[in-house]
Amino acid sequence: MKGNANIKSAIKRVKTNEKRRIQNASVKSALRTAIKQFEAKVENNDAEAAKAAFVEATKKLDKAANKGLIHKNAASRQKSRLAKKLNGLSA
């Protein structure tokens, strides 16, 4: 876990980087899961559940963008595409 670092601060950085990497992976995984759940509900033509899943996915996209996990424009693009799918379901 400590790699090849000899300096105390470098050892600490390796440790914190590993913690952050695990946390970021967890958040990204939850984000992908939320998007997949939304798309599954759209696929089943379940408008009410899709709306709730859309809100959840949008929330997770915004949080990921605020934390710098994904670029804000990437989050915006994803939200736009999800909204388009939701609106297509209503029509």
Swiss-Prot record:
InterPro entries, alphabetically?
Answer: Ribosomal_bS20, Ribosomal_bS20_sf
Q: Which GO terms describe its molecular function?
A: small ribosomal subunit rRNA binding; structural constituent of ribosome
Please indicate if the UniProt record lists Ion transport as a keyword.
no
Extract the SUPFAM superfamilies matched here. Ribosomal protein S20
Record carries keyword Signal = no
User: What GO cellular component term, any one, is given?
Assistant: cytosol
Q: Where is this region: Disordered?
A: 72-91
Provide the family line: Belongs to the bacterial ribosomal protein bS20 family.
For this entry, the protein name equals: Small ribosomal subunit protein bS20
Question: What are the leading ranks of the lineage?
Answer: Bacteria, Bacillati, Bacillota, Bacilli, Bacillales
Question: Which gene is transcribed and translated to give this protein?
Answer: rpsT
